[in-house]
Amino acid sequence: VFHAVYAYRNPDGGFGHGMEPDTASPESQPLFSIMALETLDEVGYLTKEIILKDFMPYFENITTEKGGIPWMFRPKSTYPCEEHFKTVKEWSALSTTAPLLGILEKYELDIPWMKKAEQFVWSEFERIQDKHIFCYLCVPRWLTFLEYTKSRARANKTINDLKNWI
């Protein structure tokens, strides 16, 4: 599984090459990189060293001023992709930043990047209360963060808020 996932890895440390079937673009994408991280975690091949050495340099490099990582970047190549990827907004996203933070917490990592990212995630949970869920995969990714964050009282309140919201 490890080698199958890493076949999608690019020299910049991100993952691309159509890892998600809606685009065949070889370019690294934040979402694909999160998918790779989640897959390695799920099958038991993820370690602190892999997170810090192979994943975090890419994520730190694409972090926005707000402290989060984008969901996707518009493909720069002419490879086939669904229309929604051609018009994607390249701003920080809860659905990519929250699971990354959750995995960092799960593996008991504490790196400087996490502070601003955590502020971004909590502010997004506040902001989304009047929005709609546009992706059925978003909520489970948010729960990764809420399950592992050290801020238990705040996480429990947010989970209850999400239950009411959904």
Would you name each region that the model predicts?
Residues 1-166:
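Preference for long, amphipathic alpha-helical scaffolds in soluble/luminal domains
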